[in-house]
Amino acid sequence: MPPAPATASEPPESTAPLSSSTAATESTQPPTPPAGANPVRSAVRLWLSAYRVEVMLFLIAFAVLSSFSSQRFFRQSAAPHFIYQAQSWLEGRLDVDPRVLPNLEDWACVRVVDGHKVRCEGRLLRDDRWFVSFPSFPAVVMLPFVALHGYQFNDTSFGVFVGALAVALFYSLLRFLAQEGETERNRNDNVVLSLVLAFGTLFFYCAIRGEVWFGAQVMGVALTCLYVRNAVKARRPVLAGVFYSMAVLTRTPLVFAGLFFVLEALCPGPDRLAQLKALPTAWKPAFRKLLLFGAGAAPLALLAAAYNVYRFGKPGEFGHSYFYNNRVNADIDRFGLFNLEYLSRNIQAAFLKLPQVSLSPPRLSYDPHGLTLLLTLPLLVFLLVPRTRPRLHLPLWLTVAVCALPGLFYQNTGYMQFGFRFSLDYTPYLLLLFAIGGWSLRNRAVVAVLALGVLVNFWGAVAFRGYTEFVRNW
């Protein structure tokens, strides 16, 4: 469903197309319900009037994504890890029952040897404990649905729903930024940019698959939109902290996105250097915002840390070091989860890998280790030469930089994938940079690049064959 209003005073959107000069004043007061009208019906009507664009974007995205999901839409994916985690919680256990696992792909297995927790090796033992080796918040979201459907809950159609919701939330974020004067985009521009997220980025193929890897990335985008909306100018620090913790417990690299709130709290601009110099004598307002942000993030963070200690003995360990019988274990044992050793291959996956063209027979294919972002997100070229550098230019770029670092030094490129899927963690920030960068969506070069991005990601949505197809031989 589309996002609820952030405050009771947030005005609805005008139905008329707007010029960029009136982007920040695009609202009118909601219509007054007639006397004696049903209050629930009136409230729904007012809400739909205020958020009709979000509703339409949700419906369009849901229809297109579900269509491209095709037969996957009606079946659980072959990597439903979060469903098994949620069902285990409902059964009163913190591990998962190995007897019901659908496969052994990317599950953590822990064995206690001489009082120490180690990865299971060789023949499995009765006392070995099995866990989902991914941050657990998506399983929390799935809990009520798994309570109804059990192990049979369909994570693929759920992922399509979350993907459509993320598109609506991204539009809501863009509209909010326009109303706050942070961008000069009008309603039509914001609609186009929301559709670019949906169908002109790697979000497209990730949102139609289900599967533990892609489902978490899509949910991370939705939670990022909610986090950024509340973090701008550090206006709602508690809510920003709550959504930040949800995002981090969905996609761990988003822990670095906390920098965005810190910058908004300490030095929102425009004269950031002067604001930083003044902090020693005027620190209380910023400190209060940071404290409230921490208070919002702390409950889920503490629960996750305790859960990790119970499972793996360390508060920051989600389980990848305990992968059972996995191809990445040799690298993890030698270099760890993050290392400079991995930088070269991740740079190649993110920026250098090109489509593979064969003339005999004619064939166009992709490398499942990655595909250059210059094709999957060609709008990048305009970010390097922005026409304007407004207040959010620096914090958004710094957030992109720190969120990109984990994926570049990680032991895995994201294989199997279409494009460098780890970039989806910071794709919303990149699109926001374009939104504030001053390039017109009517510019011919921009239109050509947008069309290229949609074409390439259409190819990815149609052509990518991942774990589900491999297992089921579709």
Predicted features by range, described:
Residues 1-6, 10-474:
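Membrane-proximal envelope and lipid/glycan-remodeling enzymes
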